[in-house]
Amino acid sequence: MENSEVVLQKGCVKVPNFDFNALSQVIDTVNGESKIPNPYLNNYILESSFQLMDAQMHPIFHSVWNEFEKNFNPHGRRSNIVLFFSFCSGGRSNAHADVEDVRIFGLYGKTIYIINGNEYIVTQGDLLHIPKNTVHRGIGISPR
């Protein structure tokens, strides 16, 4: 289901109750690769954004994962849920383009995505579709 338009749908994803306690449970059980995907200041590591791969392995994400696979991956291509999180306001990604379509769902907090000079605000339950090869940057307005 390929779409070449950036689309933001407000409140359309039924997300689980999620907070930083739930995040620690996911980190503790998923065994997914984790990293700081952007440059950071050595003395302020906790102000960075963090990335956790394969979050779909945790039961809290099974219903979202199954729904996304049914709606957006009809050919069963390799896919995953990647969590991006930050403990402080202002964490951001580098501007980048992905080689595949990206669907971002708001789980916790507020994030602004800058895409083609436009700002898209994503909060809990929102779904943002970013077509492949589209340059975008996420900026956390609150911890997320």
Describe each region flagged by the PLM.
Residues M1-V26:
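An N-terminal JmjN-like helical accessory module and its immediate linker preceding a catalytic domain
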Residues C12, P131-K132:
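Proline-centered helix-kink/hinge sites
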Residues D28-L127, T134-R144:
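Active-site region of the double-stranded beta-helix
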